Amino acid sequence: MASTGSARAFQADPYDYGEVRRLAAELELAEPVAVTLVRRGYRTVDAARRFLEARESHEPSEFRGMEEVCDRILAVARGPGRITIHGDYDVDGVTSTAILVSTLRSLGAECDWLIPDRLSDGYGLTMASVEQLQRRGTELVITVDCGIGSVEEVAAAQAAGIQVVVTDHHLPGEQLPDCPVIHPVVSGYPFEGLCAAGVAHKLATALCDAAGQGTVETVSGKRHPTDRDLDLVALATVADMVPLVGENRRLVREGLRVLRDSPRTGLRALMAAASVDPQTIDAGALSFRLAPRINAAGRLYRADAGVELMLTDDPDRAAAIAAELDRANGERRSAERKVVEGAERARSALPPSQADAPALVLAGEGWHPGVVGIAASRLVERHFRPTILLSVDGARAKGSARSIPGFDLVAALDATSEHLVRYGGHRAAAGLELDVDRLDAFRDAFLEHAASELDTADMVRMERLDALVGVGRDGIGMDLARQLESLGPFGMGNPGPRLLVPSGRLREVRPLGEDGKHSRFQLESGAGRAGGVAFGMNGEITRREDEALDLSVELEVDRWNGAEQPRVVVRELYALDDEPDESGRGRRPCGDGCPAPEVEWWARFDRELASVADGRPGALLNVRAPDGPRREQVDRRGGAAVASLAELISSGESVLAICADAARRAKLASAAADPRRFGAARPRIACCRCGSASLDAALTVPSGAGLALVDWTGVALRPDAVRSFRHVVVIDPPPSEALEGLARATEVGGYTHLAWGPGELRLSERLLDREWELRGAIAEIWRALPEAGGEAEGGPLRSALEGASDYPRTPETAARCVRVLCELDLCEWLPDRGTGALGVLSSERTDLGRSRSYGACLARHQETIRFLQARAQA
């Protein structure tokens, strides 16, 4: 959706550009990828390499008590006793159950499963579950994805003669069940982020090893029997929204490989029902296509349909179950929509103090308890505040809570637990149950707690950006798309990279899809274009066509019919600064100090006049670069200058941009340093016509993010000031070797970025024509002077010399023209009149070639053009 407010709903963390350069060089990464890694905390080459390789792995034996647990389980498995896997009704619980059932059966155990009914049984191991296990004659129950909080239930099971092993990953309470526990935190496992299926996989691996059925050598390398279950581990890891970092990255990557190469019968059928191509399946398909269908059965019907699907080898049976899950998912969407609509009505009926509070607690009768959790997530997306939805059934209300970053749901429920019958969950998601007569008191207490923990800023959805890019070199294109893809799998803890295209434009917008809600377009940034799409935004996209915008996008590899191409997916549109843009009006972009005060202007005029008279026109071109260290040079030519500048500004390091004429480049600077983007100040601009106050202000290194823009004249006038900036970005090529050297001089280390291309070269050549090929300027000045015998001085003379253009001539150009006029005996310079005066001696036509200075200026012109062209070839 579009954002047009004054506060920008995104942020990009500052970083050390040196770290980015090291990663890019040593790991051969495009700079936006290196920036993304550094911003995400992978700041060293070793840390980034480990992340990219995703090889982290730990042995199951690193769970304390694993050997004891395996001995206990195998003792039952080798006998006649029944083992029951007690799971849960979501994807993580279903897949964990399937992993252990299949493993134990392969080891010869009599093994079945028990998945509680969400509606009638509730979550986890309950007293009703214990009674059911007794009736089955279960000798050993292994909980998966539950049990860590079931202290009383475990005790009851053991009292009934049932052995218990708890495997779980949920947050443990103060008291643990009195039985063997396999849990990433409780058992001291090196990686605490495993989901329940990950824990079950580790247990299954340990069981096979203990039973002598571990790793074997195959033609394709070492294989473990439980490698076949990595597809289920990947599915659960993504679906349960555990962080996709550390060992989870390896598990999901390897699981996706299993899904692509040899999917099990049940998942092959489910992928067909969900229209997912196994060859291109990714974490997004797991999260948004497969997981909802498995969860739908647990929300509405029988969760063990998912277990049966994972275990069956019968294609016909798998297809039937997959079709059942697909139908359930359609019904789930309908039920979810009804709950969301009912919740919005309930919110509207609340008094403003509750409807607009930092959290929402909403209740209603007839809300399907199986979908209140996902409906709560929808309300969080809309209103961006912690939300609890409760389904009322008689005197009891059951529901789910979903949170926003920075608000701990478990802590909030702990603080209000006196009103609850039971609750549990994570920081971001929880379930709860209470008596209806405590609902109002609970709502008041929960809202009070939320108000004490959250402020207004917390309830603004903050989009965290990874990098700022344009179209072209190191920007949007196939190479970057492929490199960004290598950062996957994406999900919780490792979201897909979000890029910002600063000051981009949407061109050639066309509707997409049968209902026209979507759109395709060409995204323009700098001189480059890339194809893109936006989903559900066609109206907004169409209204904003051709407008300069900041666009939050994802860049993906679009695969279709064996072909690949980069595709931009727009997620958010942000309006640029809507204050009046005064760039392009010559005298205004630099502020009050432009043009220079009289004394300064005439001093520069006199200096150049003397240089021309000595046969050395353009003395500023020859300012000597100071001795000392030189900056590292970064070649950004062929990229988008606005994006390059904006990215460097976002780093928080000082940035100086140098161009041919800062007044003409003011619009570019404003686009790169929009003050609402990162809280940066407006760009500080000083052009070749400015006075020293403006120039000194522009070249003062800022304390925070910001941009200074000067032209090569400013660099020549203040050569030492350039050295204090961390980054110097060369927007237009330097007109001389001396000025080129100044751009690389440094006292703080740093970088010189070459950001010019053919267009900038052409502009520089045109401006050099204006500055050195004086015929047109002389003719214009001549027409503005009095008739022969007259004089011009002071303000009128300066006006004649500057001209009426939005971009007045500099004192140096004016001085060259006056020197030529004097050498041709058309004028006489009268230096004794204070600011100077010019007497007109003749109005006769003459040949400019008679002037020695005119020839010297032409020679200087050709010298600078040759230098520019040589640099263009370098």
Predicted regions: what is each one?
Residues 99, 175-218, 226-238, 437, ...:
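Short alpha-helices
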Residues 40, 144, 363-366, 634, ...:
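Structural motif
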Residues 249-292, 296-346, 381, 401-645, ...:
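Acidic, two-metal ion nucleic-acid-processing modules in DNA metabolism proteins
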